[in-house]
């Protein structure tokens, strides 16, 4: 699996999402029990309860921004869009992440996250 680089062509966010899903699939093949248990755990964590799925995706995006995890930023920006979050909702989450994480978090939000919004629009993953 090739590494992801923001210097790739305009399709790089979709490519990165595919790379992540490919890596996850490879892990599940090699470690089926762990892969299945991880997926069950995260599916339950992101299921709507007292917080909606949209709110949980926005929280996860803020965490990914602060962790400087580009794959998770891409995945959860897409998840926010898929759950009906508006660009304003997403950018507000970026702002909260920046309030906590400073300039490093803000730079990720105004580059990686913005590129995801532009590339993915309202498609599903």
Curated annotation (Swiss-Prot):
Domain of life: Bacteria
GO molecular function: oxidoreductase activity; peroxiredoxin activity
Entries under Pfam families matching the protein: CMD (PF02627)
PANTHER family referenced in this protein's UniProt entry, alphabetically: ALKYL HYDROPEROXIDE REDUCTASE AHPD, BLR3452 PROTEIN
Protein name as annotated: Uncharacterized protein YurZ
Native organism: Bacillus subtilis (strain 168)
Lineage of producing organism: Bacteria, Bacillati, Bacillota, Bacilli, Bacillales
């Amino acid at each position: 699996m090739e590494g992801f680089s923001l210097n790739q062509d305009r399709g790089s966010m979709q490519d990165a999402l595919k790379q992540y899903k490919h890596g996850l699939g490879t892990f599940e093949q090699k470690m089926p029990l762990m892969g299945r248990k991880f997926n069950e755990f995260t599916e339950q964590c992101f299921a709507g309860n007292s917080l909606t799925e949209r709110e949980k995706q926005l929280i996860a995006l803020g965490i990914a921004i602060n962790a400087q995890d580009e794959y998770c930023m891409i995945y959860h920006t897409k998840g926010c869009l898929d759950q009906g979050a508006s660009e304003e909702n997403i950018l507000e989450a970026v702002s909260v992440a920046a309030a906590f994480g400073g300039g490093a978090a803000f730079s990720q939000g105004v580059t990686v996250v913005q590129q995801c919004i532009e590339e993915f629009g309202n498609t599903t993953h």
